[in-house]
């Protein structure tokens, strides 16, 4: 349901042409787990001839430390060059799939999240 809601909001408020939703992915990060800098786009269409246009991540719990979500800002005047998000339970981060992002190492507990991708024609 959250997927469809995000799809509708982006479809109606932006010029991004969305046509489908990729299956959701459930993730758990334990102590010292992380996901390094990466982008969610592929070089060629791969899912029914579509590409990832929009990514989102929803945190499912708060009983963990660390595991912050960073997105590169592409701002050359910003020394840090990324923005850090430490979200609350069920908060969702939505961003263009071509942006570099990462999950920092979890220090304690287990970070649980659902991630998904909204798709469109290349």
Predicted regions and their residues:
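Fe(II)/2-oxoglutarate oxygenase catalytic core
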Residues: 1-94, 98-122
């Amino acid at each position: 349901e959250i997927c469809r809601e995000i799809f509708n909001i982006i479809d109606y408020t932006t010029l991004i042409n969305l046509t489908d939703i990729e299956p959701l992915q459930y993730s758990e990060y334990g102590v010292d787990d992380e996901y390094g800098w990466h982008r969610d786009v592929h070089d060629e269409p791969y899912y029914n001839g579509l590409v990832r246009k929009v990514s989102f991540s929803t945190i499912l719990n708060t009983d963990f430390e660390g595991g912050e979500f960073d997105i590169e800002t592409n701002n050359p005047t910003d020394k840090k060059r990324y923005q850090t998000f430490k979200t609350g339970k069920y908060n969702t981060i939505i961003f263009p799939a071509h942006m570099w992002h990462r999950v920092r190492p979890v220090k304690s507990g287990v970070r649980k999240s659902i991630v998904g991708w909204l798709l469109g024609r290349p």
